[in-house]
Amino acid sequence: MTSLREFRKLCCDIYHASGYKEKSKLIRDFITDRDDKYLIIKLLLPGLDDRIYNMNDKQIIKLYSIIFKQSQEDMLQDLGYGYIGDTIRTFFKENTEIRPRDKSILTLEDVDSFLTTLSSVTKESHQIKLLTDIASVCTCNDLKCVVMLIDKDLKIKAGPRYVLNAISPNAYDVFRKSNNLKEIIENSSKQNLDSISISVMTPINPMLAESCDSVNKAFKKFPSGMFAEVKYDGERVQVHKNNNEFAFFSRNMKPVLSHKVDYLKEYIPKAFKKATSIVLDSEIVLVDEHNVPLPFGSLGIHKKKEYKNSNMCLFVFDCLYFDGFDMTDIPLYERRSFLKDVMVEIPNRIVFSELTNISNESQLTDVLDDALTRKLEGLVLKDINGVYEPGKRRWLKIKRDYLNEGSMADSADLVVLGAYYGKGAKGGIMAVFLMGCYDDESGKWKTVTKCSGHDDNTLRVLQDQLTMIKINKDPKKIPEWLVVNKIYIPDFVVEDPKQSQIWEISGAEFTSSKSHTANGISIRFPRFTRIREDKTWKESTHLNDLVNLTKS
């Protein structure tokens, strides 16, 4: 059984390794001949763990300030300079309530058991007891590691591809398809990963689209032909049905709020009368009595009340699994034809997505113009012979910003990293916001632009919604995770960028700026479009995505 001390050393070695091959080799050598491979890999990828601990960095600080009898304010201030694990380690070492162990005695199994128990409690008193108990058997470095596992970020600069491909060269691609880590580990020794396929009731990484700024580019990418599909301004939903059981997952593979999808349990069996088990890729949209889509955000309970005679409608655009058959390796035109054979439309409830087989540039231009005239968001272009590749950006999207707002082919989903005091009537409150993106290579957050222009009501709400730490533009208080030039140091920084809001930002065009740290990329005339509540930081626009957007 692997000890926590061995695991910590592995994490340290991975962090200091120079590149992909070296990191993967370290992991491969470490897990060879070990019986607890699955546990090691699972804990190396805490972000994929579906256990919920009901506590963010601020809550962890609060609880350990009580346990250590230390100043919560001092601990929060220390957190502003670095990461939660370092802060807890520092104050654990200094506290006089619980003496840290001199020697590590915990196994990974002990830690995993603790995490499972922690995920089962919600009362603060129970959390305090569990956190006290684990601290009492930890060294300072042990507790730092445990807290980082709770925070779901080990800071080892190695994501799923690095870790999973240490098991087998194609393990990462198989995982994106099956989302079943345990099955991959169990089959890795048999060299039989290709046999692993979709599992009903387990979410699949959705296939994605990259931006496209010209009709000509689309034909270069799909020379053998393409489908142009209406880009619906709703919420992506992956539908799973297994006999009489149903599951509905969002684009980030989390369960969809029940009020948005409960009605589907009645209509899916009617639309798919022959299906025992099925997995669908689709979009749920609020439509009026004429089946015309209503604006994004109208799916909320309160917003829906504003639209009388409206219905939730599922626009189905793909079938990924049907009665034991994994259909992801079948060409799109065959999947679509099959879908037509097995699905019966229920008007205003479950319908086919609007799809056009494109044969020339003039036809594509006409379809795009028609979509924009109807005030739809744009088009998604798909290779007519394309297979379904989970998690990969093989499709193209053309949105209205490309034609109507200048040369930005697409908006960017940026994370709120900080804020500045407003001026005049907005003085004394956060009114201007620092937006940025995550750099996968460095593990840091980079700045892209400042954004303002919110109305008074929105600003009032944001004061409470955004969890900020006041740093008063002090360079010494810039957290380790943020890379920002001196002229853009904010009055406030977010407590945790991975828990911060994601805003869709559009503008006139992407520009070059030596003052911003996201490879010098910024946005001219940036404007807030909407909050992307359907996305986590992982689905936001990362630095490499931003670079691709500017190229297109």
UniProtKB/Swiss-Prot annotation:
Annotated Mg(2+) 2 binding sites: 377
Xref: InterPro entries: ATP-dep_DNA_ligase, DNA_ligase_ATP-dep, DNA_ligase_ATP-dep_C, DNA_ligase_ATP-dep_cent, DNA_ligase_ATP-dep_CS, DNA_ligase_ATP-dep_N, DNA_ligase_N_sf, NA-bd_OB-fold
UniProt keyword list: ATP-binding, Cell cycle, Cell division, DNA damage, DNA recombination, DNA repair, DNA replication, Early protein, Host cytoplasm, Ligase, Magnesium, Metal-binding, Nucleotide-binding
First-tier enzyme category under EC: ligase
Active site: 231
Cofactor: Mg(2+)
EC number: 6.5.1.1
Subcellular location: Host cytoplasm
One annotated Gene Ontology cellular component of this protein: host cell cytoplasm
Listed Gene3D superfamilies: 3.30.1490.70, DNA ligase, ATP-dependent, N-terminal domain, DNA ligase/mRNA capping enzyme, Nucleic acid-binding proteins
GO molecular-function term, one example from the UniProt record: DNA binding
Inducers of expression: Expressed in the early phase of the viral replicative cycle.
Reactions this protein catalyses: ATP + (deoxyribonucleotide)n-3'-hydroxyl + 5'-phospho-(deoxyribonucleotide)m = (deoxyribonucleotide)n+m + AMP + diphosphate
SUPFAM superfamilies, sorted: ATP-dependent DNA ligase DNA-binding domain, DNA ligase/mRNA capping enzyme, catalytic domain, Nucleic acid-binding proteins
GO biological process, one term: DNA recombination
Superkingdom of origin: Viruses
UniProt KW Cell cycle keyword: yes
Chain segments annotated as coiled-coil in the UniProt record: none
Binding-site residues, Mg(2+) 1: 283
Family per record: Belongs to the ATP-dependent DNA ligase family.
Subunit field text: Interacts with host TOP2A and TOP2B.
Primary role: DNA ligase that seals nicks in double-stranded DNA during DNA replication, DNA recombination and DNA repair. Recruits cellular topoisomerase II to sites of viral replication and assembly.
Protein name per its UniProtKB record: DNA ligase
Organism: Vaccinia virus (strain Copenhagen)
Lineage: Viruses, Varidnaviria, Bamfordvirae, Nucleocytoviricota, Pokkesviricetes
